[in-house]
Amino acid sequence: MEGIHSRTDFDLGNHQKFSGKKIQYFDPELGENYVPYVVETSIGVDRMFLAVLSNSYKEEQLENGESRVVLSIPAPLAPVKVAVLPLVKKDGLPELAREIMDDLKYDFNCQYDEKDSIGKRYRRQDAIGTPFCVTIDHDSINDRCVTIRHRDSMQQERVKIEDLHAIISKEVNLSNILKKLN
């Protein structure tokens, strides 16, 4: 995204006027002197990020009448890639959640959250654009599977803990966006 401003001869004309120095160009083909026009261009990453953020912000009405704020930022651009959420703060779930967090945190920016109900935690993560929430429940201890929730669709699927890294890597890889540009 770029800003382009045609300043005409305003800037150089005023500089010439107040400095007392001629800032003119002689065109030999036309045989005329004139003050050149200035075209000011401005480009920056900040404009791109503003466009992505503006386009990603959504307020959705859910079937149950509630609403949710979602920052549907593309997964490769999301600052936080995954949230690890034990269903409750007891029965060994936080310990397993911390193990999973320890496995993921070196490759992905992760958040750990055990405060409030699971629904409120999902909403908090939706609002900051976290593409994936991993929920550890009582079955996780025995079957070594967790529930991964996708932010945009709110769909949940049961996956093996050992497959989490590969699933998240595939989705947050920047090459996914780059391939769409071709």
Segments (PLM) and residue ranges:
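NTP/phosphate- and nucleic-acid-binding module
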Residues: 1-182
